[in-house]
């Protein structure tokens, strides 16, 4: 896939490139490219967190009559909600970078993507603790 505007550099849209930070030394110039890299980091970090929480819930509720079903439903809804939020915030961050005329390094996309998951965790725990 070619980049927009006369620039003949390739857009890095491979999941393997994103997760391995293979494009070392390159910069992300396109809005699509920035959004995709940030979103994939948010997606996979959220998948890791929700997977760990799901395993913990499944183990702790294995003797409960409906515990397995509750675990799957709770983790699925939580994951879908966080991925939906990650889509929107990744687009917002990429849009701000694009409007500002800045390029993004692949490591910055990692920080923004994983940072979204960390902020989601902090907000989620603070909301739970407030209800106790």
From Swiss-Prot:
InterPro entries per record: Transmembrane_pr_170
Where, subcellularly, is it found? Cell membrane
Q: How does it sit in the membrane?
A: Multi-pass membrane protein
**Transferase among keywords:** no
Chain ranges on the Extracellular side, renumbered to this chain: 1-37, 90-104
Q: Which residues lie on this side of the membrane: Cytoplasmic?
A: 59-68, 126-132
> Would the keyword Cell inner membrane turn up in this protein's UniProt record?
no
Q: Which residues cross the membrane?
A: 38-58, 69-89, 105-125
Keywords recorded for this protein, A-Z: Cell membrane, Glycoprotein, Membrane, Transmembrane, Transmembrane helix, Wnt signaling pathway
Main localization of the protein described in the UniProt heading? membrane
What Pfam families does the annotation carry?
A: Tmemb_170
Q: In which tissues is it expressed?
A: Expressed in normal breast tissues. Down-regulated in breast cancer cells (at protein level).
According to the record, glycans are attached at: 12
* One GO location term (cellular component): plasma membrane
Q: Share an example GO biological-process annotation for this protein.
A: Wnt signaling pathway
Write out the similarity annotation. Belongs to the TMEM170 family.
Q: What is its biological role?
A: Negatively regulates the canonical Wnt signaling in breast cancer cells. Exerts an inhibitory effect on breast cancer growth by inhibiting CTNNB1 stabilization and nucleus translocation, which reduces the activity of Wnt targets.
Cite the record's note on assembly.
Interacts with CTNNB1.
Q: Name the chain's protein.
A: Transmembrane protein 170B
What organism is recorded for this protein? Homo sapiens (Human)
Q: Which gene encodes it?
A: TMEM170B
